[in-house]
């Protein structure tokens, strides 16, 4: 990526990119991926599983890789054609190559957030199960499957409108038009699952992603309806969530005094946590050629670690800092490059993690943040000590004095030590570069 250009770094979870991230294992999550699949294969019965991680931590990529590999192993089990690149990658990874699964799975991916404008979440979810079950498995009788789905929908009431079953069966676009009441939802669901599962896999894994981003009423209803209506022993659910945010979402629905944590424990039989990425490894992935200034690369990595950034936050920070590097140049030392690396690195990290603190820092009211970084971020300390002062000067005192000069309204006309001098021109250029 050119240093003076901006490009979205967050990758879309397309099949091609999901395969490539598995092949390269750029963020070292293949071990976690394999461990999850091995555990999943050992679980008996109908269960609801949570995969917990922060927003932007890469949950969608992880569950998409689960979907990819479960399909791969099922195709292998039935002697069906597999994706050549994926087949090559699996055969090159000993643990994945030697994995023997006792069950075959059809994974169904459902983005809850994309459907939270629908009144009845179960209709959206079941529609995804039916359509993906058919689209991925051509052998399923489409008309029979839709007939079973129509029977299920007839038990999910929206208003008082009766469904036209023949129209629904022949016109999939009319699936959401209307429903009528019945007492046979569970039996109808069992029939639907029979159509998908019988002879073609042992289990369905329904992956529900982005639930914590949904409307509170939608998130609550999808949890409750899933638990109460679907208890087929062949069907498992994996909910990809940020548990902390989902707890807030539930409290918005039931009230702040509601014990949302205990409430969630009623639904999830197993809970898995997705570990944070290794920032150094991820930086290697983003900047494989190491074309940038060595200090700036190390600083990005250590600052992301210090502020505990998620993968998405890392992408934003990396993009901004690389762009700034392109503006200050990399040909040796300059006063502008020095103060920009010192302060822009903190300001943009704070803006990503806590915009209010970023504003306090810019206003000159957060010197303690600077002191903490000087003490705890090794490469930052090295850079300060290398350039800001020599001999009789205390580096931390000099750094704090430079901070006051840059961000205090009562600052003097310049900052000077025996190694560097920063004046009003440098300060003006810094703020110009900062907000480009």
Where do the PLM segments sit?
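Conserved Walker B
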Residues: 208-214
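P-loop NTPase nucleotide-binding core
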Residues: 57-195, 367
């Amino acid at each position: 990526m050119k240093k003076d250009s901006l490009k979205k770094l967050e990758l879309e979870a397309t099949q091609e990119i999901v395969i490539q991230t598995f092949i390269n294992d750029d963020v070292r999550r293949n071990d976690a991926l394999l461990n999850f699949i091995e555990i999943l294969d050992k679980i008996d019965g109908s269960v609801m599983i949570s995969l917990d991680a922060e927003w932007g931590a890469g949950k969608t990529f992880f569950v998409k890789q689960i979907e990819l590999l479960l399909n791969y192993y099922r195709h292998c089990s039935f002697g069906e054609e597999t994706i050549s690149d994926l087949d090559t990658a699996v055969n090159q990874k000993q643990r994945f190559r030697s994995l023997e699964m006792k069950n075959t799975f059809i994974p169904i991916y459902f983005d809850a957030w994309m459907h939270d404008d629908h009144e009845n979440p179960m209709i959206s979810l079941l529609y995804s199960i039916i359509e993906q079950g058919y689209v991925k498995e051509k052998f399923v009788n489409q008309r029979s499957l839709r007939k079973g789905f129509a029977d299920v929908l007839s038990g999910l009431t929206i208003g008082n409108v009766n469904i036209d079953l023949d129209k629904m069966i022949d016109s999939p676009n009319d699936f959401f038009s209307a429903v009528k009441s019945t007492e046979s939802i569970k039996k109808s669901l069992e029939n639907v699952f029979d159509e998908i599962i019988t002879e073609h896999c042992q289990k369905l894994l329904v992956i529900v992603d982005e639930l914590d981003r949904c409307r509170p009423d939608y998130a609550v209803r999808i949890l409750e309806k899933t638990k109460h209506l679907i208890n087929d022993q062949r069907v498992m659910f994996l909910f990809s969530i940020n548990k902390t945010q989902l707890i807030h979402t539930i409290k918005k629905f039931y009230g702040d005094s509601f014990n949302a944590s205990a409430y969630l424990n009623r639904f999830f039989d197993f809970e898995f946590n997705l570990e944070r990425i290794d920032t150094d490894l991820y930086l290697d992935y983003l900047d494989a050629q190491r074309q940038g200034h060595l200090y700036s690369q190390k600083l990005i990595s250590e600052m992301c670690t210090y502020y505990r950034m998620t993968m998405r936050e890392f992408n934003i920070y990396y993009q901004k800092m690389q762009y700034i590097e392109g503006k200050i140049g990399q040909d040796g030392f300059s006063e502008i490059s020095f103060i920009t690396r010192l302060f822009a690195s903190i300001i943009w990290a704070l803006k990503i993690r806590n915009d209010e603190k970023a504003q306090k820092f810019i206003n000159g009211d957060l010197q303690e943040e600077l002191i903490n970084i000087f003490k705890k971020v090794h490469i930052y300390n090295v850079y300060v000590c290398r350039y800001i002062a020599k001999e009789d000067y205390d580096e931390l005192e000099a750094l704090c004095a430079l901070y006051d000069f840059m961000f205090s309204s009562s600052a003097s006309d310049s900052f000077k030590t025996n190694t560097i001098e920063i004046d009003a021109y440098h300060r003006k250029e810094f703020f110009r570069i900062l907000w480009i």
